[in-house]
């Protein structure tokens, strides 16, 4: 039995959120394959940590046990992560950024100690990660705003194995503007079902400290 951590980083009301519908659909299909897996949901709107932004006044105390170590340990305790995030002003959401700032900690999720070339080595190489992203514009309209690739590179930096992301794009263009989240996500249903089945089939690997 695997432990699956579902991280939600959308600030939009759940009833009208494309990210919420995409995530719920994916988890539903995942559980059809692995009904006994343990699912842990982390809604970043509901935890104080994700409301705290790194700045000059809190730098000394930002990486503490409650806000940082707890969530790093959580990542080490699970086998798979689903990270759901909409594009917000050409970037990841503010809560997603706050979360990542708390867990991207040297010698805890990545390290330069064991590198022979001087680059960082990720310490979460047990994790498999599925990114579920949404955006109003079609992919490529704003090349500087590829939040999906931003997330993919960030999780890979921590050593995780990121499978092919699912991006639901173009939700705000005229032909899609009047579609509900359910209607728009229905158009990706076959892809979601397939990727959820593939993700469910990945092995559950326990975290181990990197051997020196």
Swiss-Prot record:
How does the cofactor attach, per the note? Answer: Binds 1 FMN per subunit.
What residue stretch is flagged as signal peptide?
none
Q: Which reaction does it catalyse?
A: 2 a quinone + NADH + H(+) = 2 a 1,4-benzosemiquinone + NAD(+); N,N-dimethyl-1,4-phenylenediamine + anthranilate + 2 NAD(+) = 2-(4-dimethylaminophenyl)diazenylbenzoate + 2 NADH + 2 H(+)
Task: Share what the entry says about its subunit structure, partners included.
Answer: Homodimer.
Q: Which SUPFAM superfamilies match?
A: Flavoproteins
**Keyword NAD recorded:** yes
Q: Where does FMN bind?
A: 10, 17-19
Q: What is its EC number?
A: 1.6.5.-, 1.7.1.17
Query: What is the source species?
Result: Malacoplasma penetrans (strain HF-2)
Highest taxon above the source species: Bacteria
* Keywords annotated in UniProt: Flavoprotein, FMN, NAD, Oxidoreductase
State its role: Quinone reductase that provides resistance to thiol-specific stress caused by electrophilic quinones.
Family matches, as HAMAP family = Azoreductase_type1
Protein family according to the UniProt entry: Belongs to the azoreductase type 1 family.
Where, by residue number, does the polypeptide cross the bilayer?
Answer: none
Q: Name one GO molecular function term.
A: FMN binding
Q: What class of enzyme is it?
A: oxidoreductase
Q: Which InterPro entries match?
A: Flavodoxin_fold, Flavoprotein-like_sf, FMN-dep_NADH:Q_OxRdtase_AzoR1, NADH:quinone_OxRdtase_FMN_depd
Instruction: Give cofactor(s), names only.
Output: FMN
Q: What is this protein called?
A: FMN-dependent NADH:quinone oxidoreductase
């Amino acid at each position: 039995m695997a432990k699956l951590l579902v991280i939600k980083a959308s600030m939009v009301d759940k009833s009208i959120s494309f990210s919420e519908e995409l995530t719920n659909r994916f988890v539903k299909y995942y559980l059809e394959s692995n009904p006994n897996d343990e699912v842990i949901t982390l809604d970043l709107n509901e935890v104080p940590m994700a409301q705290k932004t790194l700045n000059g006044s809190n730098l000394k105390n930002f990486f503490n046990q409650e806000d940082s170590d707890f969530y790093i340990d959580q990542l080490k305790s699970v086998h798979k992560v689903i990270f759901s995030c909409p594009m917000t002003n050409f970037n990841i959401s503010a809560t997603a950024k706050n979360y990542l700032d708390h867990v991207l900690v040297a010698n805890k999720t990545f390290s330069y100690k064991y590198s022979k070339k001087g680059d960082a080595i990720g310490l979460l190489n047990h994790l498999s990660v599925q990114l579920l992203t949404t955006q109003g514009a079609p992919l490529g309209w704003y090349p500087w705003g590829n939040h999906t690739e931003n997330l993919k590179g960030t999780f890979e930096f921590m050593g995780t194995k990121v499978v092919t992301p699912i991006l639901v794009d173009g939700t705000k263009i005229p032909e899609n503007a009047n579609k509900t989240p359910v209607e728009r996500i229905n158009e990706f249903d076959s892809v979601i079902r397939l990727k959820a089945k593939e993700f469910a089939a990945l092995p559950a690997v326990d975290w181990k400290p990197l051997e020196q």
